[in-house]
Amino acid sequence: MLYPKIGIRPVIDGRWGGVRESLENQTMRMAENAAKLISENLKYPDGTPVQCVIGCTTIGGGVEAARVAEQFSTQNVTATLSVTPCWCYGTETFDMDPNTIKAVWGFNGTERPGAVYLAAVLAAHAQRGLPAFSIYGHDVQEANDDTIPDDVAEKILRFARGAVAAGWMKNKAYVNIGAVTMGIAGSFCDAGVLQKYFGIRAEWVDEVEILRRISIGIYDHDEYEKALAWVRENCKEGFDKNLGKNLPPVITKSKIVPADKDWEFIVKMTLIIRDILYGNPRLDEMGWHEEALGRNAVVGGFQGQRQWTDWLPNADFTEAIMASTFDWNGPKAPTPFATENDTCNGIAMMLGSLVSGSAPCFHDVRTYWSPEACERVTGQKPDGVAANGFIHLINSGATALDGSGACVDAKGNHVMKPFWEMTDADIKACLNATDWCRADYEYFRGGGYSSHFRCKAEMPVTMLRFNIVEGIGPVLQIAEGWTADLPDEIHNTIDKRTDPTWPTTWFCPRLTGQGAFTDVYSVMANWGANHGVTVYGHVGADLITLASMLRIPVTMHNVPAEKVYRPHAWASFGTQDQQAADYVACKQYGPLYR
C-alpha cells in the first residue's frame, strides 16, 4: 500500500549572496532530524515505522514551494511539517494545499528570527483559512544546536500521530454487517458524517451473506481447521447460566444450531466476517474472486440483536477476537469492530486505537457506584483510585481480551501492548484470564459464547465516545482515568447483580473538581450514550489534537490545559474559554472533506 506520509518542508530565506548559502545545511538538518524523530518513534497500525518525505529542495519562494508540492503529490503526503531556523517569506513559501494537515516549526534562536517567520506564516494560514499547528521551543537554543528539545519533540510527535491517523482512515470503509440494533441511535450509520469528517466510505452487508458463505463453503477450510483447533485448546468454557432453567418453547424452538456445534459455526462466522472486511487471497485461489477483494475496511460492526441472535449463535467471540491483538495466527493488528453495530462507538474504537496502538475495548457504560452505595451493598468502601466511586463498564458478552490487563511489561506492570510487542506469554495470559460462558438463552436464543473476564489490574486508560448531535454535528467525549482492581468481596457482590458471564472493567476517571469532572457521578451523568470505548494509556491530548484536525469539537475532557494542542488559529476564536473556541473554530472551518 502507499502509506500516508508526513512531508517535511525545509523553508529558508531566499536571498542568495551569502544569506541562503549560510542557512542551507542548518535548515536541511532540521528537516532530517524531524523526519528521524518521527520515523523512530511512531508506527503505522500495521507496525511499520511512519514514513516521511523530505522536500527535494529548500523552499525560498513560490517556485520551490510548487516543486516540493508536486513531489509530495505523488507520495500520498497527507500532512506537512514546515521547518525553519530563520526569517522566510510567508505566503511565498507556505503550504497552500487545502488537502494537507499543516504544522510549522520555527527554531527558537537569537541569531536568526525563526520565530518571526513562524508568527508571520501562521498569520497567513489564519487569513487564508488554512489552519496550521504552531511549534516553538520554550527555551532559546544556540544556532549550532541540532538537538530537538523535549517540548518541541512532544508537539511534533503529537501532530504527526494525529496526521497519520487521519491519513490512515482516509478512503477506507466502515463496513456495517446488518443494520440498526434494537433502536440504538448510534447504530444509524450516517454516511455523510463518515464521508465529510473522516474520508470514510460507508458500506452495508446483510447478515445473510454470512449464511451464504457458510452454506456454500466460501472460506479457507484449512484455516478453519486451524482456528477451530486453537479455540478448543485455548478457549475454556465457563459458567452456563441456562442450566436448571425451564425455558419456554419460544426459546427452545429458536435455537437452530445444536449447542455442541456452536463453536464450529462461530469460527466459520469469524473467518467470514474478517474476509468481508479485509478480503482474502485464498478465496481468489478457490475461484471466489469478488469475495476475495473484501471491503477495504478500517472499522466495522455487527448488528446481531435481534434478528440474528434470536435464532443463531451470537458474534461475541467474533467481536472480541477481532478487536484483540492476537488470534490463532499469533499477534495481529486489532480491528475496531462494534457490538450492536454501534457505528458511533465503532468510530470511537477506531480513533482510540489509531492514537494509542492498543486494542479498543467496547463497553456498556453500565452503572455509577458511589462509595456509599458500594458500602451499603458490599459492606466495604472502595479505596485507592476507586475511593471516589467508580463506573461499571461491562459489555453484553464481547470486548478485546487485552482488556483483561493480563499482559505484563518488563517492570512487572500490567499493561495493554501494541500487537508488535505481544509475546506468546502475553497471549497465553489473556486467554487464561478469559473464559467463555454460554450466552443467556432468554436474551440470546440462538446461543453463542460470551468473553468473560475481570480486569484485575490498575492501568491508565482513556475512555472516549463519538456522538452526533442535531444542530452541532459530530462531537467527541474524553475521560482519562484508571481501571481498578477491586477487592473480591466488592467485585463478586456487584458482578453478580448484573450478568456474571460478561467482561467487567471498573473505571475511575481522573477528577478535576470542575464541570463534568466534578465527581465520578458527573462523568456518568454527562456521558452522551450507553456505550463507550477504553484504550490503553492517557491519550486524551492526542485525541484532542486529532479531533481538531478533523474539525470535531470535544464536549468534555479532563486533559491538563498545558497538554491541549490545537491549530494556532483556534486562539483567534478566544483564549479564555477554550471549549467554546473549539466549537466555533470547528464550525467555521467545517469538516475536513467538504
Residues covered by each model-derived region:
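An N-terminal assembly and electron-transfer interface module characteristic of large anaerobic redox
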Residues: 1-594
